[in-house]
Amino acid sequence: MPGGHYAHTVVADGLVFISGQLPINESGEPCTYLGFAEQTELAMKNVATALQAGQCDWRHVLKITAYITDVDNWPLFNKVYATYVGEFKPARTVVPVPALHFGALIEIEAIALRNGDSASR
C-alpha cells in the first residue's frame, strides 16, 4: 500500500472506511503509464487489500466512490468493477474530476461492514 499522512483503513463501530486508492503498485510506485483498465484493476486490487486489512471483503462493501478523469472511461470502469463486486451491488457514485494525484486516471474509496455483520441490499 502506498504511504501518506493518513490511514488507508479505519474501523469504527463495525464500519470500515477505506481512503481513496490510486493505481500504485506494491513497491509504492504510481503506475500512471498504464491504460485506464489496468489502472482501474490496480486501484481495485488496492481496495481489496484495504478490505482485508479491515477484516472484510467485497461482500461487505456498502458504498464505493470512484473518481475518474474522463467520463468516456465510465463503461470500461463498469466492466472492471463488475469483476470484483460480482452479484453484490453496493451503493456507488462515479465522480468526473479534472485531475488526480500523480496524473492517475482513477481513484477509488469504499465503506464496508466488518466481517460478521450483514447488510440488506
Label each region the model flagged.
Residues M1-R121:
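Short, polar/acidic, helix-capping and beta-turn segments at strand->helix junctions
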